[in-house]
């Protein structure tokens, strides 16, 4: 098996998300191509060491001028390549690190969100309502199964998200009607699949081995199920997958333009706006951390910079003489 295929397979065995597997494979390929350019020949990772990784990371920081987050992503991927795929611990690294910028997220106010949602429809609108109304990542929205939404308790169970953690978040009352309609749409797709003998969806790795029959259950169908069937890329069976997050991202950009919003608006902007709005309305930083699923509260504290500072409540002197 080729080394890049080994990266993909190792990610699958460890039950990493498809996005993580794709990212790790991409960085492994970029690294090996860079080594080839430097040495003039292909070199197997077993013949490389920490100095090669340090040189590549330094190249990213000094020549390509990547962001600190990008360099850290590359580092994680290469540590995975050596430790988990090749089986070599390359020890501590001493590369030049990219400078981390002081990033303040772009957020929308309530009027802007209302305008944005007004130009969205169907699954695009519902996905955005869950990102803004429950603080979900776009990947978490599209990973939801029918069973993860409890309409009675008004909760959403986010399973095995970033960092392989589960968490419970609120289900916005305003989204319940749309959730019911979407679940009914999925039920119709499920009934069609049962009739054609192809009611099957992909299950999480460990659970798939323990309970393979669950792949044919309506409870495990994606809430944002694709309208078209597709074949599993590895095993070849015909079934359903969820809609692609890129579709809603394109819709958001178009909706923002039509609404006359001149800020940069992405799926993550809605999550940022959720966090900021909760804080401005009296939520604690700890509550926001738990709702967002952050491991480190320092990650959450960046939203404190987005809230309206108390100093802005001071009346401008110009107002007194106007």
Task: Please state what every model-predicted region is.
Residues 1-322:
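Conserved catalytic core of the tyrosine transesterase superfamily
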């Amino acid at each position: 098996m080729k080394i890049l295929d080994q990266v993909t397979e190792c990610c699958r065995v460890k039950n990493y998300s498809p996005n993580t597997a794709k990212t790790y494979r991409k960085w492994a390929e970029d690294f090996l191509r860079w080594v080839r350019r430097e040495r003039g020949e292909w070199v197997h990772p077993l013949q490389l060491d920490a100095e090669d990784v340090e040189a590549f990371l330094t190249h990213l920081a000094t020549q390509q001028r990547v962001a600190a987050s990008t360099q850290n992503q590359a580092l994680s991927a290469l540590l995975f390549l050596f430790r988990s795929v090749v089986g070599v611990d390359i020890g501590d690294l001493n590369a030049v690190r990219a400078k981390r910028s002081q990033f303040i997220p772009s957020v929308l106010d309530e009027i802007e969100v209302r305008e944005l949602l007004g130009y969205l429809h169907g699954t695009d609108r519902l996905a955005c309502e869950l990102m803004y109304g429950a603080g979900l990542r776009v990947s978490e929205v599209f990973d939801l199964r029918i069973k993860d939404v409890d309409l009675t308790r008004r909760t959403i169970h986010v399973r095995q998200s970033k960092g392989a953690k589960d968490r419970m978040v609120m289900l916005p009352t305003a989204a319940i009607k749309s959730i019911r309609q979407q679940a009914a749409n999925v039920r119709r797709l499920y009934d069609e699949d049962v009739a054609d003998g192809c009611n099957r969806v992909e299950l999480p790795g460990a659970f798939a081995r323990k309970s393979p029959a669950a792949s044919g259950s309506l409870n495990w169908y994606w809430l944002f199920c694709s309208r078209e069937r597709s074949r599993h890329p590895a095993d070849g069976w015909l079934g359903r997958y969820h809609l692609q997050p890129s579709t809603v991202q394109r819709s958001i950009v178009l909706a923002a333009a039509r609404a006359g919003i001149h800020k940069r608006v992405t799926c993550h902007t809605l999550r940022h706006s959720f966090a900021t709005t909760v804080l401005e309305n009296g939520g604690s930083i700890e509550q926001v951390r738990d709702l967002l699923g952050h491991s480190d509260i320092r990650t959450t504290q960046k939203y404190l910079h987005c809230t309206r500072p108390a100093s802005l409540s001071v009346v401008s002197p110009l107002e007194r003489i106007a």
